[in-house]
């Protein structure tokens, strides 16, 4: 039987929207190229604002049972080696972020989707959208060696930053000056391990650390794509040299052992234009990508899924699935994340001026209450408008 909704991509965004629509009684087919459990290149950090969304999806208890690390806030070290700390704190109450492997998180979300009645098909490689005039009515893809088409009333693309559907429909808009490449892996025996997300600024980008278990640390290196190309080094050699040449990390990694393959993603920095075709929506990274220094990809995934599910429910009930009818989701998405995009762009500009980055971090180190506000924005529970104001800028810069 033809599904009401075809969701492409079973990451957090795809699994979340599938859960929400299945609860409304729709027949949902969720297709994924990989098989589970599967890993992803990700900082593996869930901001405090993710917690109520995970509870809404019915997976919070399962995630807490998986023993995630509870992060108290974030630390940022500037180019000179000076650090500022910001806590996850709101109205005097301490909050926390969660960190756990995507291998675990994605599997728990997909299991919940299946419990809600979602049909899951793994190993299905989507090749292109299926078009009926100006309407996207499904996808054509491949399962093992067999070509196949799948039709649905509504297609929701949750197929990530390299979205096949966005590219095939000509909707990808590259942000060339923000192109980065990310390398991610896990290390054991990093000393000391900190209950914080940590960011270390380096001339070409930054290094991120976050504990994901009692013994493992997620280590991410994010660099400008042009810088990586100019080094002419292999990914493995570049990653190892970048970590080992940082003064603090060289000491903390003296006994460390890499315990996972090095994962790579990028170049990344793009937005997806509002579809002109009927019958399709884009969520998560497929709808546009923040630089991970300020963006919180998993929160974006879950929140955009919530926005999309509400619009999709109204559209499916009324049968109004044209591009104009679905545009309300695009506008809601833009309202929800526009200021975070603006802040991301400003921070990336600042990171290209070490003197400015050093000045800001020095001020935040001297005024911890301001650092708490910045970290609250990164944690998705303080509005980006707070730090985009002239008043806040003068407090940090003057």
Pin down the residues of each PLM region.
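Residue-level detector of alpha-helix initiation sites
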Residues: 11-12, 36-37, 104
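C-terminal helical "tail/cap" subdomain of flavin- and related membrane-associated enzymes
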Residues: 313-398
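Beta1/beta-strand and adjacent pyrophosphate-binding region of the FAD-binding site
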Residues: 1-13
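A conserved beta-strand/loop capping segment in the N-terminal third of enzymes
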Residues: 56-107
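Conserved N-terminal glycine-rich FAD pyrophosphate-binding loop of Rossmann-like flavoproteins
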Residues: 35-55
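FAD/FMN-dependent oxidoreductases across multiple families
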Residues: 66, 229-311, 315-317
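Predominantly flavin-linked oxidoreductase catalytic cores and closely associated redox partners
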Residues: 112-249
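Glycine-rich FAD pyrophosphate-binding loop
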Residues: 22-42
């Amino acid at each position: 039987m033809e599904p009401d909704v075809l969701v492409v991509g079973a990451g957090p965004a795809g699994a979340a929207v599938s859960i929400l629509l299945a609860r409304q009684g729709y027949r949902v087919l969720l297709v994924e190229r990989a098989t589970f459990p599967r890993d992803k290149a990700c900082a593996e950090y869930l901001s405090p604002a993710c917690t109520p969304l995970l509870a809404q999806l019915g997976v919070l208890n399962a995630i807490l049972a998986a023993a995630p690390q509870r992060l108290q806030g974030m630390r940022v070290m500037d180019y000179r080696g000076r650090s500022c700390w910001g806590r996850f704190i709101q109205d005097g109450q301490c909050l926390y972020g969660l960190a756990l492997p995507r291998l675990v998180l994605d599997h728990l979300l997909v299991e919940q989707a299946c419990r809600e009645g979602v049909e899951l098909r793994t190993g299905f490689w989507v090749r292109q959208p299926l078009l009926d005039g100006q309407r996207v009515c499904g996808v054509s893809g491949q399962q093992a060696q067999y070509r196949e088409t799948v039709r649905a009333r509504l297609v929701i693309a949750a197929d990530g930053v390299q979205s096949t559907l966005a590219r095939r429909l000509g909707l990808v808009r590259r942000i060339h000056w923000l192109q980065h490449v990310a390398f991610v892996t896990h290390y054991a025996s990093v000393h000391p391990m900190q209950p914080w997300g940590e960011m270390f600024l380096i001339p070409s980008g930054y290094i991120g650390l976050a504990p994901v278990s009692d013994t493992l640390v997620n280590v991410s290196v994010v660099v400008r794509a042009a810088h990586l190309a100019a080094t002419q080094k292999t990914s493995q050699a570049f990653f190892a040299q970048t970590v080992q040449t940082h003064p603090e990390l060289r000491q903390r990694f003296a006994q460390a052992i890499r315990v996972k393959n090095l994962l790579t993603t990028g170049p990344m920095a793009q937005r997806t234009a509002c579809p002109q075709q009927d019958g399709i929506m884009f969520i998560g990274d497929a709808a546009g990508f923040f630089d991970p220094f300020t963006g919180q990809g998993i929160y974006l995934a879950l929140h955009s899924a919530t926005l999309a599910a509400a619009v999709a429910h109204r559209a499916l009930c009324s049968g109004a699935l044209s591009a104009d009818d679905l545009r309300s989701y695009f506008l809601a998405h833009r309202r929800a994340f526009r200021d975070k995009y603006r802040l991301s762009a400003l921070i990336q500009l600042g990171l290209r001026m070490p003197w400015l980055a050093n000045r800001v971090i020095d001020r935040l180190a001297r005024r911890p209450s301001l650092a708490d506000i910045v970290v609250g924005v990164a944690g998705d529970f303080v509005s980006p408008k707070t730090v985009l104001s002239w008043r806040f800028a003068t407090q940090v810069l003057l």
